[in-house]
Design a protein with these regions (language model features):
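Aromatic-lined carbohydrate-binding surfaces of glycoside hydrolases
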Residues: 2-166
Length: 166
């Protein structure tokens, strides 16, 4: 595949459609056929967490600022410099639709993320009988560390299906 997850924090988080279109066209020129497509992942996650009974505040405090989203997606970091605004989420959805359309027009198979097991603290609080692992990373205070749902939890498959549906 093309691009690495950190590119979406270090390089692309504030790109507009014009910049993305140039990059996608360049990918096609070089024969890239499996580019990562992680734009709007948090908007999809927000829909899933709403369906799982969390409110917007519980969900929004989970996300980092745009430049830190790759580390959030990898389960390293939550909340840092967040939250994301409604306008950001809506713009990212529209941008991702343009990105996916262009990639497919050029014969690419975009690689979109699915559920990796990282859950908002609000989900942990709503399910006290479920075992979660509280991760540590990079010396950040505990409040910024991720919770991981074990893959053998019945919630894991349910949430995973919702991510694919959304």
């Amino acid at each position: 595949y093309f691009l690495n997850v950190c590119t979406f924090g270090c390089t692309t988080p504030y790109w507009d459609w014009e910049r993305w279109e140039k990059e996608i066209d360049r990918m096609a020129l070089y024969g890239v056929n499996m580019p990562l497509a992680t734009v709007a992942s948090e908007a999809i996650a927000e829909r899933v967490w709403l369906r799982m009974g969390l409110n917007k505040e519980e969900i929004r405090e989970f996300f980092t600022a745009p430049a830190h989203l790759p580390w959030h997606r990898m389960g390293n970091l939550n909340k840092w410099d967040g939250p994301l605004s409604d306008a950001w989420q809506q713009n990212q959805i529209a941008l991702q639709h343009q990105i996916l359309t262009r990639m497919r027009e050029l014969g690419m198979q975009p690689i979109a993320p699915a559920f990796a097991g990282f859950v908002p603290e609000g989900f942990v609080q709503k399910h006290p009988d479920t075992q979660f692992r509280h991760m540590r990373w990079g010396g950040f205070d505990e409040e910024y560390n991720a919770y991981v749902l074990p893959p053998d939890s019945p919630f894991f498959e349910e949430i995973g299906k919702l991510f694919v549906e959304e």
